Amino acid sequence: MVDELVLLLHALLMRHRALSIENSQLMEQLRLLVCERATLLRQVRPPSCPVPFPETFDGESSRLPEFIVQTASYMLVNENRFCNDAMKVAFLISLLTGEAEEWVVPYIEMDSPILGDYRAFLDKMKQCFGWDDDEEDEDEYEEDDY
């Protein structure tokens, strides 16, 4: 019985050693693959965006429709970057300057729920900066995510 246990222990130790060697080899392969991936990623250039980066918005009412179209178009072609309403609103906020930037500060300070609701945020912007929706605009926004 003792001899059998010694043989079993010896077999287990041999298996352990073989697995340790295999594990070391796999770790080395993983390290090489990570390095190769990094090298390949440095060589890849992301495709250029067909829609230019939107201009900033300073609160000038006549520019609000243009601003909304520019930002919506940009977010549409870069949809992987704008996966939820909070990201969309944050993007819009990053482009606000002047009076428009001053307008949004209280919403940020009170961590308003509107910061996570893209459509509600647009509606508030339209109310504040004087753009009245007609029925056609409302139907268009109901069809789109932007």
UniProtKB/Swiss-Prot annotation:
Q: Name the GO terms of the biological process aspect.
A: cellular response to lipopolysaccharide; cellular response to muramyl dipeptide
Q: Where in the cell is it found?
A: Nucleus
Q: What is its main location?
A: nucleus
Alphabetically ordered keywords of this record:
Nucleus
- Please indicate which superkingdom the organism of origin belongs to: Eukaryota
What is a single cellular component term in the Gene Ontology annotation? Answer: nucleus
Function comment: May have an important role in the development and/or progression of some cancers.
Assembly, in brief, is: Interacts with NOD2.
Q: Which family does it belong to?
A: Belongs to the LDOC1 family.
Name of the protein this chain belongs to: Protein LDOC1
Q: Which organism is it from?
A: Bos taurus
